[in-house]
């Protein structure tokens, strides 16, 4: 099928998730003059922080530049991870063995924390503990998964196991991979429904949420901070910046430490039920070991493939990226070559130079960011931990708090180097697959 023919008649440049939970435009409350805590960013992290602060009686104002539900928290793939993407050896080299162990152990707690939050707040978002299949793009990648299995089991207590190529079709109906790994500690949800449910819980708890209220500047003053917004000036005792892949000039120090990267997703037209069940028979979340990775799943109702990946390292619209994603999907399942696309969308994720999420304080301003494209559970958890810290309720320091946070000389937050790095990664992935053919 030619790239021009992949679009279904009802194609939309919008997330599939918005069919069930479009961004809502709530009445914008009058901004309080002096909230105890002002939170910039109403994604998972900011809302989670607001909810926990209200549980401890702290007055909270959450502001966001866009409509609530219009950014990454409702644009992702709805995959819920319970581990970091970096192994213990790399973490130990950067932070020492003890801190490396603490980071991996605490990252595993993110999944349980999210599950408890969903139950406590009665958030209905099609959550399931599905497990995750990681497909090896070449034999050496499969061999490398063995150490990941051992690390996951030893340090997190979660189950994980290798799947040899001869048994691969028990997990995914393709010969595209050279075996893989299943990690039990992983789940799936509807990200827009989760975000809406979290925002509703925050409002019920008594926090003020003001959308379409961008913050132009944060200035330190005696006893707190002044925030200059599009709707007036607000003074707060504490400030949290929770803008992740959309961090701008409001906090230049943080922006210099984050690498925003566009991630793209397509949704197919509905498939015959028996076809969808055969493609991913156990309903796992699927990712691969490519440097330019793909991630995909079935929709919550089991009727469509939602296929995501790094389709472009340059600025591209979702419509422009859709043909590449479609081709990537067909490389896994050639039978879907004539399956059309009904939705395509994109949103920013944020990476860091050390491949680790961070929370901390700079010049008095709290921040949490850099979830490496796996922020559904991690961003929620870091928001919670930041709130505990502000409220003085932390039982123990969070392992992700106050880590050295690197940047690079002359880097200002515009990742000009991504097209070059992306092309290099694509070439290496291609060569490894070619040699394995």
Residue ranges and their predicted role:
Residues 1-37:
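Extreme N-terminal leader/targeting segments of oxidoreductases
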Residues 35-62:
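N-terminal Rossmann-like FAD-binding beta1-loop-alpha1 element of flavoenzymes
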Residues 104-111, 135-144, 181-200, 210, ...:
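Short beta-strand to alpha-helix junction loop
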Residues 112, 120-128, 215-217, 233-363:
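Active-site substrate-recognition segment that forms the wall
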Residues 84-166:
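Dinucleotide-binding Rossmann-like beta1-alpha1 core, especially the glycine-rich loop
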Residues 55-75:
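Glycine-rich FAD pyrophosphate-binding loop
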Residues 315-317, 322-431:
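C-terminal catalytic lobe of FAD-dependent flavoproteins
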């Amino acid at each position: 099928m030619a790239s021009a023919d992949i679009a279904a008649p009802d194609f939309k440049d919008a997330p599939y998730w918005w069919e069930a939970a479009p961004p809502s435009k709530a009445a914008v409350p009058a901004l309080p003059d002096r909230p105890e805590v002002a939170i910039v960013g109403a994604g998972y992290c900011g809302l989670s922080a607001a909810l926990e602060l209200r549980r401890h009686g702290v007055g909270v104002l959450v502001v966001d530049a866009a409509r609530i539900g219009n950014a990454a928290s409702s644009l992702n793939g709805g995959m819920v991870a319970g581990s970091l993407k970096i192994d213990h050896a790399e973490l130990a080299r950067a932070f020492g063995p003890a801190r490396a162990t603490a980071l991996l152990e605490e990252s595993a707690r993110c999944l349980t924390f999210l599950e408890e939050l969903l139950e406590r707040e009665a958030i209905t978002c099609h959550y399931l503990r599905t497990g995750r299949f990681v497909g090896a793009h070449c034999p050496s990648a499969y061999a490398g998964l063995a150490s990941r299995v051992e690390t996951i089991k030893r340090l997190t207590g979660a189950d994980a196991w290798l799947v040899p190529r001869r048994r691969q079709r028990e997990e995914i109906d393709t010969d595209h991979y050279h075996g893989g790994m299943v990690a039990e500690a992983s789940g799936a949800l509807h990200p827009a429904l989760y975000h809406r449910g979290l925002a509703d819980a925050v409002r019920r708890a008594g926090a003020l949420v003001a959308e379409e209220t961008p913050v132009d500047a944060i200035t330190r003053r005696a006893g707190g901070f002044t925030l200059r917004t599009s709707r007036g000036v607000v003074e707060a005792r504490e400030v949290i910046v929770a803008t992740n892949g959309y961090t701008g000039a409001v906090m230049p120090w943080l922006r210099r430490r984050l690498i925003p990267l566009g991630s793209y997703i397509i949704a197919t037209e509905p498939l015959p039920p028996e076809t969808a069940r055969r493609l991913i028979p156990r309903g796992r979340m699927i990712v691969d070991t490519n440097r330019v990775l793909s991630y995909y799943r079935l929709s919550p109702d089991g009727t469509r493939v939602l296929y995501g990946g790094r389709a472009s390292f340059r600025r591209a619209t979702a419509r422009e990226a859709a043909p590449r994603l479609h081709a990537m999907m067909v490389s896994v399942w050639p039978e879907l070559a004539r399956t059309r696309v009904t939705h395509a969308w994109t949103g920013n994720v944020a990476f860091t130079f050390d491949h680790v999420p961070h929370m901390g304080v700079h010049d008095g301003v709290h921040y949490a960011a850099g979830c490496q494209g796996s922020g559904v559970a991690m961003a929620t958890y870091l928001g919670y931990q930041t709130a505990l810290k502000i409220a003085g309720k932390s039982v123990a320091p969070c392992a992700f708090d106050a880590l050295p946070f690197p940047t690079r000389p002359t880097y200002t937050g515009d990742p000009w180097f991504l097209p070059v790095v992306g092309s290099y990664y694509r070439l290496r992935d291609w060569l490894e697959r070619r040699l394995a053919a």
